[in-house]
Amino acid sequence: MEMMVHGRRDEQYGGLGLGLGLGLSLGVAGGAADDEQPPPRRGAAPPPQQQLCGWNGGGLFSSSSSDHRGRSAMMACHDVIEMPFLRGIDVNRAPAAETTTTTARGPSCSEEDEEPGASSPNSTLSSLSGKRGAPSAATAAAAAASDDEDSGGGSRKKLRLSKDQAAVLEDTFKEHNTLNPKQKAALARQLNLKPRQVEVWFQNRRARTKLKQTEVDCELLKRCCETLTDENRRLHRELQELRALKLATAAAAPHHLYGARVPPPTTLTMCPSCERVASAATTTRNNSGAAPARPVPTRPWPPAAAQRSSA
């Protein structure tokens, strides 16, 4: 009876362990009462399982009854009396009963208080990124506003010219590709445009002219490069043919003919200037060989004294 009162008190306080000392005393007293009780009758119902259990502060144990009822009574006490804060933690046992009890009870006040403030790491990161993105968006909006102010409060539109205006601008550009401020203002008044528009048109026209000239120069250089490449290939082929012909002629011609060395014939041609130089040298050698030699006197001159006496 005392054990039942103890169990109800534990259930009333939610297993907070307030009856630890009382459980020790009641456990010992319950064991003594079981020893003094007479054996149960055949027609009587077995005693409830709560009376077979005691509390020793560290876990549940059965009273001094028979051994064949000890283990079953201990398991029954574990199932009936739930004291999660006072019993030991079994790492091999899943907390199914506690989960079921918590689900049946519903969310507690502490959980309801924590739900609005609780958030996952992803939500925390998203909130931080949102806070960081807000200044960047504000900065972009401010930059766009400043651009609008600089551009006069609106986007710059492309200048549309009539045929007459374009013709006048083209003629003026052919005469002068650059304009001074006075010419620019006069042309703007003539065409009913702004000086800035005239200046921009001339800048674009100069850029287009330069680009076209660059393209023309590039095409000309490409053609020159192709021509030089073809000429270089032709010269290489001729050089290889001449070398092969020279080697073949040198191998076929005899080296000595009647004791005199005969130079191998060659088909190499010389430029006109080289031929003129060679012909002039040959003519000089031939003329010097055909001219008669000057006679050398063999009789000595008479002495000067004999000539004076004869005179």
UniProtKB/Swiss-Prot annotation:
The keyword Acyltransferase does not apply. Induction: By auxin and sucrose in primary root apical region. By wounding in leaves. Residues 212-256 are annotated as: Leucine-zipper. Residues 280-289 have a biased composition (Polar residues). InterPro entries: HD (IPR001356), HD-ZIP_Homeobox_LZ_Class_II (IPR050762), HD-ZIP_N (IPR006712), Homeobox_CS (IPR017970), Homeodomain-like_sf (IPR009057), Leu_zip_homeo (IPR003106). Keywords: DNA-binding, Homeobox, Nucleus, Repressor, Transcription, Transcription regulation. Residues 29-69, 97-160, 279-311 are annotated as: Disordered. GO terms for molecular function: DNA-binding transcription factor activity, RNA polymerase II-specific; sequence-specific DNA binding. Residues 294-303 have a biased composition (Pro residues). Residues 154-213 bind DNA. Homodimer. May form a heterodimer with HOX2, HOX3 or HOX7. Probable transcription repressor involved leaf development. Binds to the DNA sequence 5'-CAAT[GC]ATTG-3'. May act as a regulatory switch to specify provascular cell fate. This is Homeobox-leucine zipper protein HOX1. It comes from Oryza sativa subsp. indica. The lineage of its organism: Eukaryota, Viridiplantae, Streptophyta, Embryophyta, Tracheophyta. The gene is HOX1.
